[in-house]
Structure formats: C-alpha cells, structure tokens
C-alpha cells in the first residue's frame, strides 16, 4: 500500500482508529509514517492560530522553509465588507501553507496587452475578497534552532532553543533570541498590488541574508478605504470607518510579532519595508498612534505620507464614497437617515461592480480614489502635523528614490501623447496643455512658476519637453516629498539614511526615454540579480549583491553601510545620500538629491501660493495685476537659479 504524505488544506491532528487493529500494529504503522513523513514534519510550525505546514526550497545552496497563504483575519466578506479586520479563528488540524493566496479585489492594467513590462504588476492569482493571508520565508537552519511554538517557547521536541550565534559576512550576529524579520508591504497606489507577485519572491533574500522575510495581502481600493463614518450616526461609525486596509496591515504585523519565535525570528528585531504605496504604508504604520512602537525600523522606497497621492482629507474621502454609493445605485442621500439600508445595499453589490465603478472618481495623474484618510483615529492629523510632535529618537529609517520616478505615470495618463518604446518630440503647445492638466488644481501663479521651472532652455525643445514633464511629475509626487519628509524625520530624532537609485537595468522592457522607472530598484533590493537563471550583466549582479546587503545590514543594525564603508546620516543641514549605480566613475556620496529642484517645491512654491492668496483677495487694498505678478515670480525664480550656481549640491 502506498502511503502519501500530501495534506489537504486542514488536516485533523489525530484520526480515530478501528478498535480491531492490534496496538503493536498501530505502533508499527506510526513508526513507518514517521519515517516516511519525517522530512515534512520539519516543515510544521505551531502558530498562535494553529499548526501550518510549508515547503522546502534550496537557494544558493541554503535551505529555506516557505509558508504561503496563512490566514490572519476572517474573510472580509458579507457583513465584514468595509469593516476593520477580525482575527482569524484558530484551527486544530495542520494547515497546508504551500499555495499562493488570492489577490485582493482590484482591476488589471491592460493598456498594453501581452506586454511583460506591464504584466509583472498584474495579479498572478485569482482576485477575491477572501484575501487576508500572510507569507513567510525562514532559513531552515535558524528556524529549526530557534523556532518555538506560540504556547511554550520550546521546540516541538520539547528542547529549549540553543544559544549559538550565527555568522553572516564574517561578522558575528547575536541571534540568541532569533533572526531579524523583514516585513514587505506592496505598492499599487492603494488601488492594486499583491504580495504574491514574482518580483516579491523572497527566497534569495532569506537564504543569502540569513533573515526571515514576510509579506501579506491587504485590502485596496474601496474595499480597503471606503470612508463614510462622518456621514452616519455615531452608532454606525464602524460600518465604513475608512483605512481598513491600514488596519489589515496592522493586524498582520501584530500576528507576525506574536509568532516571530515560531518561525525562528526575534519579535524585537523587526523591519518594515515597502515601495510606493507600500512605502507610505510603512510610514503610516511607524507614525500612527494605533501601531506606534510596534516596529521602530522602516525602509521607505519612493513613497512618504506627505506626498499628494498618499493621503486625503476626511471630506474628500466622504465625497468619493458617496459618489461610489450612487454609482452602485444605493442612494447616498439616505446615509444620515437610513445608513443600515445603504450599507446593506453596498454589501449586496457584486465585488466586480464596486471594483470597476470606483474608478469613476479617478481625477487625474496620481489622484487615485482611495488613499489613507485623515480619520482622527489611525491618522489623527495630516502627516506633517503629526511629525511636529513625534519623538523618533529610537527610530531607524532607510529611504530613497529612483532617478526617473515620473515617466511611468506620465505614459499611462497621457497615452495619446506618448509611446512606451520611443521618445516623443512634443510641441510647446502640447507641453503646456499637459502641464496645465497635471497641475490644474494649483493657482495660476503656481502653474506659471512650475512651467517656468521645467521649461528647457537648451537642446532639442521637443524631446526636452517630454523629459521635463517627466521630471516635474517625479519631483512633485515622489522625490521632493521624500526629501522633505527625510529632513523632518531627522529633525525629530530619527537616524535617517538616504539612497538614490540611478541604474537603468539591462532587463528593462520599457523605452529608453523612460529611464530608471518607478519600481526598478525592487528587484535589486530583493537580490533577484543573484539568480543565475536570469539574464543580468556581471556589474548588475554585483549591484544586486550590494543592495541586498544594504537591506540586510539595515535590518540587523539600523545602518545600511557595509564594513568600512562611509554612508553618513541624512539631515537638513547635511543632506548626504548614497548612489546605487553600476558606474564606478560616479562618486557614491552626494548632497541632495535634486536639492535645487526640491527647494523649488518645498520652500519656494508655498510662498508663491501664499502670495497668490493675498493678491486674489477681494479686500479694498490694491492688487497686483496677474501679468506683473507672473513677471515677479519669474524674476524671483531667475534669481534663485542664479544663486544655485554658487551652492554645492
């Protein structure tokens, strides 16, 4: 008789035996099964929710145990749709944690059907509201040494975890209480994204870095951020409080902290890291009073909470929520008088309908209809106000940007103007049309200042116009908010290290004009170039090794520098950053980044806004004509530009 060790999704811990089987035979069968399934038994981890069985992979000559699809919350369906997450019910059998979970409900990007450069960001599993699951990668040796069940601090065999120190890169690392844990939060504009994407595979990071890596799904779009509480009587506030996607993240992080020892990790040695909306999520989890102090080390890639796309007011979120209700034929006018009826209606609407209809409120480049909301609870105030009273003396931050943050979004929002493969010679009138569209919510004075700042005065005007718009988008929405926030973090006591990724990878499928795209650094930080089956150049493999090392060193020490390497802390007074590049001729340290351009956004433009507000008033005082006002602005910018040449950045 063949005996299979394959397990169903949940197996009972014991099965009733027929009374006619003699006890000696039972023992023989038990010993035989133990021998056959012994390897699989090593893959069972006792968590606080129940036992889970993963799978073993060998990477770079090292064994890693991988657990995918561990539920951390009840499926947020039916009455739980739009509500805060509820912890998963414990299970008693062994849970099969070898398959990928569903992706939270979202729409696919299909502007370029069949194009792999776009497809890598689309869901690679079925979409479902039942999506709140965790993934864990744990080095096998460390997990078997330190892994302890959540109920006793011991190994399954009853022995205490040993106190050996592991060696990494020749440096002794004190892992007596377990390994460091890195927790990844994916991006996608709070509208899309999935922890299951191939680019987020952490096999190499866990194996080479000798760290535990985890990731999880969280709700996006209206399912994660519908905010209606202010419109309803107080007793209905929990029907759609908003920010439940952030509450999902918080619950997953707490679950991982509670179960760190079970996987061989140290719950006091945790680092959050993420990119774009995932980076802003890291920011939110570090700063929110709900999770403050839960983790004190974070890596933020191309995204901070002060970015225009990364937060919205309660009023704006309510406006968008009411529009969605009406688009779903559930009558938002009844929210105050009959909220139960409205929410019952919204919970009866097909998930696909909500997923599609929510995009009706997309209002222009990087103006997504869902974002973290200033709700008075998870986010009590706007990000920079929260920063004013923050005490961050024990916090370590690694943050940065890529060189061409804006081109990806420019292409998608103005697809009728640009080609993904070839550069476009853009006439001045089209340039002005696009710039006025992007910055249409700014005052006229601000728009004129922005256009002046990003007008090319040399070279081929047509191609330069395209490049300058990309720079304006990248600076405004990503690099300069990051720059501003990094300075504020340092001022509040955090230890901040800043990087700037400038390498255009040889594997890029996008046109040369798009440069170093938003998200291009992810594969390098995850160590993908170390995978010899992938087509990277030798210098790129070295860069991948260096960048993975920076992540690991930061997770272990709070400082991304390698032994003997200089990487000073970043501050407003000394804005030193580290350049990740394959070009050995480039100095690794510089000042900025983009200090002059970011001074325009962070220091000068707010003054233009205040001046415009003064002149636009309808008081009896004399006002400056728009023409003189704009000439004055242009003159001031010119003076600033002249002064820049005497500064070192």
Curated annotation (Swiss-Prot):
Pfam families with a match to the protein in the record: COesterase
Propeptide position ranges: 620-649
UniProt superkingdom: Eukaryota
Known catalytic reactions: acetylcholine + H2O = choline + acetate + H(+)
GO biological process: acetylcholine catabolic process; acetylcholine catabolic process in synaptic cleft; chemical synaptic transmission; choline catabolic process; choline metabolic process
Post-translational note: Proteolytic cleavage into the 16 kDa subunit and the 55 kDa subunits originates from the hydrophilic peptide, aa 148-180, and is associated with excretion out of the cell.
Major site of localization recorded for this protein: other
GO cellular component: cytoplasm; extracellular space; plasma membrane; side of membrane; synapse; synaptic cleft
Site, as annotated: Not glycosylated: 569
GO molecular function: acetylcholinesterase activity; cholinesterase activity; protein homodimerization activity; serine hydrolase activity; sulfate binding
Residue positions with a glycan: 126, 174, 331, 531
Lipid positions (GPI-anchor amidated serine): 619
Keyword Cell membrane set for record: yes
Localization in the cell: Synapse; Cell membrane
UniProt KW Transport keyword: no
InterPro entries: AB_hydrolase_fold, AChE-related_enzymes, Acylcholinesterase_insect, CarbesteraseB, Carboxylesterase_B_AS, Carboxylesterase_B_CS, Cholinesterase
Keywords, comma-separated and alphabetical: Cell membrane, Disulfide bond, Glycoprotein, GPI-anchor, Hydrolase, Lipoprotein, Membrane, Neurotransmitter degradation, Serine esterase, Signal, Synapse
SS bond partners: 104-131, 330-345, 480-598
Function: Rapidly hydrolyzes choline released into the synapse. It can hydrolyze butyrylthiocholine.
Oligomer and partners: Homodimer; disulfide-linked. The active unit is formed by non-covalent association of the 55 kDa and 16 kDa subunits.
Similarity annotation: Belongs to the type-B carboxylesterase/lipase family.
This protein's name: Acetylcholinesterase
Organism: Drosophila melanogaster
């Amino acid at each position: 008789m063949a005996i299979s060790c394959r397990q169903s999704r949940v197996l009972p811990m014991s099965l009733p035996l027929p009374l006619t089987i003699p006890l000696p035979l039972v023992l023989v069968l038990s010993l035989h099964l133990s021998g056959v399934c012994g390897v699989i038994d090593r893959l069972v981890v006792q968590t606080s929710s129940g036992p889970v069985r993963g799978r073993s992979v060998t990477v770079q000559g090292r064994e890693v145990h991988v657990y995918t699809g561990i539920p951390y919350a009840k499926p947020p369906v039916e009455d739980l749709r739009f509500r805060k997450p509820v912890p998963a019910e414990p299970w008693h059998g062994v849970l099969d944690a070898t398959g990928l979970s569903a992706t939270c409900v979202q729409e696919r990007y299909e502007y370029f059907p069949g194009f792999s450069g776009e497809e890598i960001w689309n869901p690679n599993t079925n979409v479902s509201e039942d999506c709140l699951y965790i993934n864990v990668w744990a080095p096998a040796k460390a997990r078997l040494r330190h892994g302890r069940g959540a109920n006793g601090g011991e190994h399954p065999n009853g022995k205490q975890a040993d106190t050996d120190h592991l060696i990494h890169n020749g440096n002794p690392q004190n892992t007596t209480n377990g390994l460091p844990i890195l927790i990844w939060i994916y991006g996608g504009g709070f509208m899309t994204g999935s922890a299951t994407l191939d680019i987020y595979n952490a096999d190499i990071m866990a194996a080479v870095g000798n760290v535990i890596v985890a990731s999880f799904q969280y709700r996006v779009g209206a399912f994660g951020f519908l905010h209606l509480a202010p419109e309803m009587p107080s007793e209905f506030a929990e029907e759609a409080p908003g920010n439940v996607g952030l509450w999902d993240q918080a619950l997953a992080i707490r679950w991982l902290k509670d179960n760190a020892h079970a996987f061989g990790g140290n719950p006091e040695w945790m680092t959050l890291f993420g990119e774009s909306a995932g980076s802003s999520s890291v920011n939110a989890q570090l700063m929110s009073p709900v999770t403050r102090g839960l983790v004190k080390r974070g890596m933020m890639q191309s995204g901070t909470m002060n970015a225009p796309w990364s937060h919205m007011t309660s009023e704006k979120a309510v406006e968008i929520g009411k529009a969605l209700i009406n688009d779903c034929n559930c009558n938002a006018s009844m929210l105050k008088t009959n909220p139960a009826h409205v929410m019952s209606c919204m919970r009866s609407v097909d998930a696909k309908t909500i997923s599609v209809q929510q995009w009706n409120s997309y209002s222009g480049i990087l103006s997504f209809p869902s974002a973290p909301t200033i709700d008075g609870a998870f986010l009590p105030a706007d990000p920079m106000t929260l920063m004013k009273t923050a005490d961050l003396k024990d916090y370590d931050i690694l943050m940065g940007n890529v060189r061409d943050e804006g081109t990806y979004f420019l292409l998608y929002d103005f697809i009728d103007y640009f080609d993904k493969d070839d550069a476009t010679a853009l006439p001045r009138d089209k340039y002005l049309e696009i710039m006025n569209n992007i910055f249409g919510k700014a005052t006229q004075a601000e728009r004129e200042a922005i256009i002046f700042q990003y007008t090319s005065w040399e070279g081929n005007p047509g191609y330069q116009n395209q490049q300058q718009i990309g720079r304006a988008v990248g600076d405004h929405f990503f690099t300069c908010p990051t720059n501003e926030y990094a300075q504020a973090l340092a001022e509040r006591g955090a230890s901040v290290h800043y990087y700037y990724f400038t390498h255009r990878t040889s594997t890029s499928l996008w046109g040369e004009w798009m440069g170093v795209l938003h998200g291009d650094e992810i594969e390098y930080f995850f160590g993908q170039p170390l995978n010899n089956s992938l087509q990277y150049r030798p210098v790129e493999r070295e860069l991948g090794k260096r960048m993975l090392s920076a992540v690991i060193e930061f997770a272990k020490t709070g400082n991304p520098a390698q032994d003997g390497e200089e990487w000073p802390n970043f501050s407003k007074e000394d804005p030193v950053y580290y350049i990740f590049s394959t070009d050995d001729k480039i100095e690794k340290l510089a000042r900025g980044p983009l200090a002059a351009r970011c001074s325009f956004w962070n220091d000068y433009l707010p003054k233009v806004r205040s001046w415009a507000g003064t002149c636009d008033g309808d008081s009896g005082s004399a006002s400056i004509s728009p023409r003189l006002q704009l000439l004055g602005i242009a003159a001031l910018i010119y003076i600033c530009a002249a002064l820049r040449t005497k500064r070192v950045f």
